[in-house]
């Protein structure tokens, strides 16, 4: 990633505006992924052979708990380490692996300007700034559409272990955004402020969603293959065909944001604040789904993915097959429907995030001088976040509570902090290192810190030194991911973490 920035700042006199900032920002980034994997076959494949006695352990391995009974126990790494296995490129047999190999490039040029202002309105001091950004984006992606060929290899018609040119795909797009912003602060009374902010923001879609790559899969299930060749039957019963791909033409996530807050600073260190916020999500990435003809794919130059003798079936005995219970005599050929679903990502989903937040920092010497140095800081955030299709917005908990008790005096500082948040949607790595959504259970975490700043001490030779000890997750809370039924699918245990810091400042 490369970034360059040119900025000019100038002060303004005899005007409502006190300072102006203009500039240009350029950045580019490149991301690639090579989904590489291998499977091992014995040198005797496709024939089998006995396990050499040198690799055997005494007795059998009890796998009855997995329904596998008792199996031969042997050192599985030994034959591999001795060169008795041959590694085979899994990408030649797994279309989804090749379809997850890609690169994405992006160039972003931003013109920006901001003006700071300070004035009075009806006797109230008003400060703030107004600004704009003009953002030009050029993005592109190249990759592969993983497809099984007539030789049953993936994109390797010549069996030369090179990806066929017909499987290569590339797309690019350009777009512009105008992003205004406004921040206003009004001092309605001594040390009391009303603040308002409005702006438009954008955020790139996930890199894996912007990839050009994709793949075609076929489910070798006779009940799906024996579905009538009509769109109505496919919509009712399903289909063995499926296609998945990213979308390099995706626009950024876009939001119009509004914030209103009241702040009261009743002490040099004490304040209370109440805020409300609203985010109008005018563009969000969603899952697209389209019925296509897999013998004439309009999304891939009319490609025909059907392979005679591989995608069809010869019935071995009389009977009814498929969800429609169609009768086939032994020896009959069953041909799958031409139609299936193409899944991809697209723009256009909308939603909103709204909520309120209460924040306070209260030095307890306001209660009693005997409590000088002690204090409490806390916040409570309530969020209602949802997309128009009813799905959740990643990273958003409905409730987040935090409370910190502290003591600060004469260079000595102690803090205990607790945070509680409800469950939230997130992303995690799934099979073949792919990204999938997951629900993270709510947690309550306890952290602590103790430190001493020697600049407050009488040891002049130690002035500038600060020593601190931090502890996080002191109650050893696990990180849990659950499925739609609330069953824990992943549990990660990190345990408490302790960090001892020595910082020295020379000025």
What is each of the regions a protein language model found here?
Residues 1, 5-13, 17-21, 182, ...:
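Conserved C-terminal beta-signal and adjacent last beta-strands/turns
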């Amino acid at each position: 990633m490369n970034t360059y920035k040119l900025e000019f700042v100038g002060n303004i006199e005899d005007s409502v505006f006190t300072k102006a900032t203009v500039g240009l920002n350029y950045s580019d980034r490149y991301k690639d992924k090579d989904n590489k994997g291998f499977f091992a076959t014995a040198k005797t494949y496709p024939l089998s052979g006995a396990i050499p006695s040198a690799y055997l352990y005494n007795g059998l391995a009890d796998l009855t708990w997995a329904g596998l009974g008792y199996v031969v126990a042997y050192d599985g790494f030994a034959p591999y380490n001795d060169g008795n296995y041959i590694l085979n490129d899994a990408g030649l047999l797994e279309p989804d692996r090749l379809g997850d190999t890609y690169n994405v490039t992006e160039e972003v040029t931003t013109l920006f300007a901001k003006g700071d202002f300070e004035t009075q309105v009806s006797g109230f001091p008003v400060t703030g700034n107004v600004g704009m950004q003009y953002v030009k984006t050029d993005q592109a992606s190249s990759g592969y559409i993983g497809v099984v060929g007539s030789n049953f290899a993936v994109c390797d018609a010549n069996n030369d272990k090179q990806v066929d040119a017909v499987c290569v795909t590339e797309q690019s797009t350009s777009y512009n955004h105008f992003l205004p912003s406004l921040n206003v602060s009004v001092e309605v009374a001594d040390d009391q402020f009303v603040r308002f902010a409005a702006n438009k923001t954008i955020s790139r879609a996930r890199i894996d969603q912007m990839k050009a790559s994709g793949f075609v899969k076929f489910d070798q299930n006779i009940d799906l293959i024996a579905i009538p060749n009509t769109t109505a039957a496919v919509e009712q019963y399903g289909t063995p065909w499926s296609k998945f791909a990213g979308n390099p033409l995706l626009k950024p996530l876009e939001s119009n944001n509004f914030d209103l807050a009241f702040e009261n600073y009743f002490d040099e260190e004490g304040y209370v604040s109440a805020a409300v916020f609203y985010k109008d999500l005018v563009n969000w990435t969603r899952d697209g789904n389209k019925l296509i003809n897999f013998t004439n794919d309009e999304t891939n130059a009319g490609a025909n993915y059907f392979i005679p003798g591989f995608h069809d079936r010869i019935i071995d005995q009389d009977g009814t097959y498929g969800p429609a219970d169609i009768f086939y005599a032994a020896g009959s050929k069953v041909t799958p429907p031409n139609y299936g679903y193409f899944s991809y990502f697209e723009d256009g989903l909308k939603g909103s995030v709204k909520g309120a937040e209460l924040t306070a920092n209260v030095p307890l010497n306001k209660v009693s001088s005997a409590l000088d140095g002690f204090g409490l800081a806390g916040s409570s955030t309530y969020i209602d976040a949802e997309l128009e299709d009813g799905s959740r917005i990643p990273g958003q908990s409905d409730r987040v509570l935090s409370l910190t008790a502290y003591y600060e005096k004469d260079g000595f500082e102690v803090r205990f902090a607790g945070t509680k948040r409800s469950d939230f949607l997130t992303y995690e790595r799934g099979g073949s290192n792919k990204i999938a959504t997951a629900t993270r259970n709510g947690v309550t975490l306890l952290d602590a810190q103790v430190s001493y700043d020697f600049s407050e001490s009488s040891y002049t030779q130690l002035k500038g030194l600060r020593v601190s000890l931090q502890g996080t997750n002191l109650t050893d809370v696990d990180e849990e991911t659950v499925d739609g039924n609330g069953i824990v699918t992943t549990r990660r245990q990190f345990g408490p973490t302790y960090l001892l810091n020595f910082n020295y400042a020379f000025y």
